[in-house]
Amino acid sequence: MTDKIRTVQGKVISDKMDKSFVVAIERTVKHPIYGKFIRRTTKLHVHDEHNEAKLGDVVEVRGCRPLSKTKSHTLVRVVEKAQA
């Protein structure tokens, strides 16, 4: 049985924790009455074993078992490094 694990891309907005960072994931949703598309943001706490991701990087993350009270995602790869 092969299940495709869902991965999402987002931007690192905080990397002050050791082996963790916060990523913001933007999505667009349609307003139920007016029909206008609105940007919504979700913040996720992500586990980063080797402290690879830095502030401003675009990263790919996937869900995993709960690692702490707020952390239940892990880093897959850094898609794009932030401008220095």
UniProtKB/Swiss-Prot annotation:
Coiled coil: none annotated. CDD domains: Ribosomal_uS17. GO terms for biological process: translation. Keywords: Ribonucleoprotein, Ribosomal protein, RNA-binding, rRNA-binding. The keyword rRNA-binding applies. One of its GO terms (molecular function) is structural constituent of ribosome. GO terms for cellular component: cytosolic small ribosomal subunit. InterPro entries: NA-bd_OB-fold, Ribosomal_uS17, Ribosomal_uS17_bact/chlr. Part of the 30S ribosomal subunit. One of the primary rRNA binding proteins, it binds specifically to the 5'-end of 16S ribosomal RNA. Belongs to the universal ribosomal protein uS17 family. This is Small ribosomal subunit protein uS17. It comes from Histophilus somni (strain 2336) (Haemophilus somnus). The gene is rpsQ.
